[in-house]
């Protein structure tokens, strides 16, 4: 089996972790899911936001460990920055097939409402201003850069019961 890296992306509240939990083991045969939010919840279960920086560092260390071992893995991100672009190029040069699955929401207000619902159910909060910034940046970065950097990408509408494919593409 070839080495693969799967990036589950989208705005806060888009359902990335929920999607990953069913998609990765069942559809993608990728049981290794590296998630900073889940790491933070393990470090500080009653206040995961206090462990966010440490969790982010641990996530990057775990990614590096997988790369050293030549293992396949998946991780999630909002794509609000350009930090993964250089890494994606390097991963592809190392023989990894890199796929990106982006879960869309119609607007930042929907993302804010979903995060508020997650908090009501005991999940972690994200400040409204951060959600708005990441929402705009993530979609812009997908369209301008990330979908051209990976081997394959798919964009889903994640408003309904299950994500609906909107568009997809492949690169050489």
Regions found by a protein language model. Name each.
Residues 7-10:
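The Walker A (P-loop) glycine that initiates the GxxxxGKT/S ATP-binding motif of P-loop NTPases
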Residues 16:
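Conserved lysine of the Walker
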Residues 144-172:
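NTP-dependent small-molecule kinase module
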């Amino acid at each position: 089996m070839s080495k693969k890296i799967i990036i589950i992306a989208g705005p806060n509240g888009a359902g990335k972790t929920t999607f990953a939990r069913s998609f990765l083991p069942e559809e993608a045969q990728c049981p290794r899911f590296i998630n900073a939010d889940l790491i933070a919840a393990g470090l500080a279960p009653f206040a995961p936001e206090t462990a966010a920086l440490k969790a982010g560092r641990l996530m990057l260390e775990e990614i590096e460990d997988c790369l050293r071992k030549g293992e396949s893995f998946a991780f999630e991100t909002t794509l609000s920055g350009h930090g993964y672009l250089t890494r994606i190029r390097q991963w592809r040069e190392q023989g990894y097939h890199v796929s990106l699955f982006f879960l869309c929401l119609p607007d930042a207000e929907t993302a804010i409402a979903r995060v508020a619902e997650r908090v009501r159910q005991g999940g972690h909060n994200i400040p409204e201003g951060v959600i708005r910034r990441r929402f705009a940046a993530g979609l812009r970065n997908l369209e301008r850069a990330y979908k051209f950097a990976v081997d394959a990408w798919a964009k889903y509408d994640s408003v309904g019961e299950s994500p609906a494919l909107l568009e997809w593409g492949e690169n050489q």
